[in-house]
């Protein structure tokens, strides 16, 4: 079931957090046990790009950035994804021409524009499928907490607007596992954006002694936005972040509609949005991820004044992706050497 994250997750003090804390202790113990178990190993370098919390953090454009750089370096990258929100069961290699978001999920379909993508709840099986296709580098989209595949390097992405939320483990807060466990198993953190919420992230990550990197999301629709008035709608992890980005590009956001993450818009939803925009002489605005789901609707052709906002990651360190990939390969070679010594 696709739901929105509760508002109290992002507040320091809440009665609901207090009420759910005993349940979060149990969930935290279970997630810790999952994370420290022995992992299946594949004979390919594996970079995991995950996050600490439930809800969107900006992983998808980061995975895309790594896929692009990996190809520039001569790799044939393959992306392992859960295919969240899609109906397909078992392992499936995405065909962008024939698959749609209802079958394989919106994120996986976006990623398939840039690399081979295999979806499965078992990431080891998905990685094996990519190996059969000739891929020589695995980019794991999420999966840090579920621990279904050994990873040579784990990069965790944090949305600076939300940080770690109230710092509690699900369901009392947004954390997918205790911070102590996640910190011990990660390799570095990528903080996207800047806000007051990120100060705590910087403090806590710095205390671990592990690397903290910085980046910003850059809209690719900037030339189309200035001076226009919008009805903006989105079904993503943090719709307010999208609405704010339009304003930062000198667009005027008159109306907003927020839907649950990975929401599939009905024909009625879209007709209502089109009608509202026409009545108020507004442009429609949505995200590239939302648009992959809109493409399954019969009303898509009626979305005349629609601007689709895609984003890319602007890393503070220009050669960031190359640097991380070099570290991944170094660890992979070390892993192979140790294996050969033992066997």
From Swiss-Prot:
Reaction catalyzed: a lipid A disaccharide + ATP = a lipid IVA + ADP + H(+)
One GO BP annotation of this record: lipid A biosynthetic process
Top EC group: transferase
Residues that hold ATP according to the record: 53-60
Record keyword Iron-sulfur present: no
Molecular function terms from GO: ATP binding; tetraacyldisaccharide 4'-kinase activity
Record's keyword annotation contains Secreted: no
Any single Gene Ontology cellular-component annotation: plasma membrane
Pathway: Glycolipid biosynthesis; lipid IV(A) biosynthesis; lipid IV(A) from (3R)-3-hydroxytetradecanoyl-[acyl-carrier-protein] and UDP-N-acetyl-alpha-D-glucosamine: step 6/6
SUPFAM superfamilies: P-loop containing nucleoside triphosphate hydrolases
Keywords (A to Z) from UniProt: ATP-binding, Kinase, Lipid A biosynthesis, Lipid biosynthesis, Lipid metabolism, Nucleotide-binding, Transferase
Classification via InterPro entries: LpxK, P-loop_NTPase
Coiled coil: none
EC numbers for this chain: 2.7.1.130
Family (UniProt): Belongs to the LpxK family.
Function noted in UniProt: Transfers the gamma-phosphate of ATP to the 4'-position of a tetraacyldisaccharide 1-phosphate intermediate (termed DS-1-P) to form tetraacyldisaccharide 1,4'-bis-phosphate (lipid IVA).
Name of the molecule in the record: Tetraacyldisaccharide 4'-kinase
């Amino acid at each position: 079931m696709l739901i929105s994250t509760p508002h109290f997750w992002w507040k320091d003090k809440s009665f609901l957090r207090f009420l759910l804390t005993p349940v979060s202790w149990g969930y935290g113990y279970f997630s810790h046990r999952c994370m420290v178990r022995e992992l299946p190993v594949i004979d390919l370098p594996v970079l995991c790009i995950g996050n600490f919390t439930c809800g969107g953090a900006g992983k998808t454009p980061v995975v895309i950035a790594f896929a692009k750089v990996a190809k520039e370096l001569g790799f044939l990258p393959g992306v392992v994804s859960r295919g969240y929100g899609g109906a397909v069961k078992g392992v499936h290699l995405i065909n962008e021409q024939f698959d749609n978001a209802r079958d394989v999920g919106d994120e996986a379909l976006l990623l398939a524009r840039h690399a081979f993508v295999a979806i499965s709840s078992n990431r080891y099986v998905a990685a094996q499928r990519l190996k059969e296709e000739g891929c020589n580098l695995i980019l794991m989209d999420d999966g840090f907490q579920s621990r279904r595949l050994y990873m040579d390097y784990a990069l965790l992405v944090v949305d600076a607007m939300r940080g770690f939320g109230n710092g509690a483990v699900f369901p009392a807060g947004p954390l997918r596992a205790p911070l102590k466990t996640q910190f011990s198993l990660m390799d570095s953190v990528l903080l996207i954006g800047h806000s007051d919420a990120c100060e705590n992230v910087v403090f806590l990550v710095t205390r671990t002694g592990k690397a903290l990197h910085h980046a910003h999301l850059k809209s690719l629709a900037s030339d189309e936005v200035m001076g226009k008035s919008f009805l903006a709608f989105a079904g993503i992890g943090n719709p307010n972040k999208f609405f704010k980005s339009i304003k930062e590009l000198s667009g005027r956001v008159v109306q907003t509609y927020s839907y649950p993450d990975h929401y599939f818009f009905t024909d009625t939803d879209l007709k209502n949005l089109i009608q509202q925009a026409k009545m108020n002489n507004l442009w429609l605005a949505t995200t590239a991820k939302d648009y992959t789901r809109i493409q399954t609707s019969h009303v898509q052709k009626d979305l005349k004044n629609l601007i689709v906002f895609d984003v890319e990651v602007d890393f503070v360190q220009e050669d960031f992706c190359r640097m991380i990939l070099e570290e991944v390969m170094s660890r992979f070679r070390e892993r192979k050497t140790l294996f050969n010594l033992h066997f």
